[in-house]
Amino acid sequence: MYLIAGLGNPGSKYEYTRHNAGFMVIDDLAKKLNIKVNKLKFKSLIGEGFIGDEKVILMKPSTYMNDSGKAILDCFNYYNLSAENLIVICDDIDIPFGTIRIKKKGSAGTHNGLKSIIYLIESQDFARIKVSVGQNDKYDLKDFVLSQFSKKEFEVLEKEIDMSSDAAIKIVEENVDYAMNNFNGKSVI
């Protein structure tokens, strides 16, 4: 079983902000897998289904970004999951726009959602799919990640979202290394 968690903030105010790229990928993945993400459980909206024979839980934590680890920990405890069964999808401001980056494990960097998860599950050993949301050199970081995309940027983001949901499927079907080799370094621009 895999828990695939897309990070973001709940509510229409944040729906199309840069910080909600993880939620957008979960929505796309749910469409591709015909899974309804509409059940309230684990401080989240979740949906359950399968990728091949592997059970998956798609999750959109409703705890707000900085407390994402609370929702994931609740699910971990309920299903007795380990870090190897977790895929986290989140926004990233450090990789080139038009790309995604898959990592097998690692630190949180500046991402508070990842910091919360690492702290609460006490492990950095989980896969993550980082979705580029553009690079910021003009604005306060908080203002930037809570801003919306321009129409032109959103067209690029939609391609990144499609690639990210495909990558999540390949991680489950194959493994993280396979997904890294097939998606890292590719640009949708």
Curated annotation (Swiss-Prot):
This is Peptidyl-tRNA hydrolase. GO terms for molecular function: peptidyl-tRNA hydrolase activity; tRNA binding. The record marks 91 as: Stabilizes the basic form of H active site to accept a proton. Its EC number is 3.1.1.29. It comes from Finegoldia magna (strain ATCC 29328 / DSM 20472 / WAL 2508) (Peptostreptococcus magnus). InterPro entries: Pept_tRNA_hydro, Pept_tRNA_hydro_CS, Pept_tRNA_hydro_sf. Belongs to the PTH family. Pfam families: Pept_tRNA_hydro. PROSITE patterns: PEPT_TRNA_HYDROL_1, PEPT_TRNA_HYDROL_2. The record marks 9 as: Discriminates between blocked and unblocked aminoacyl-tRNA. It is found in: Cytoplasm. The gene is pth. The keyword Hydrolase applies. TRNA binds at residues 14, 64, 66, 112. PANTHER family: PEPTIDYL-TRNA HYDROLASE. Its main location: cytoplasm. NCBIfam families: pth.
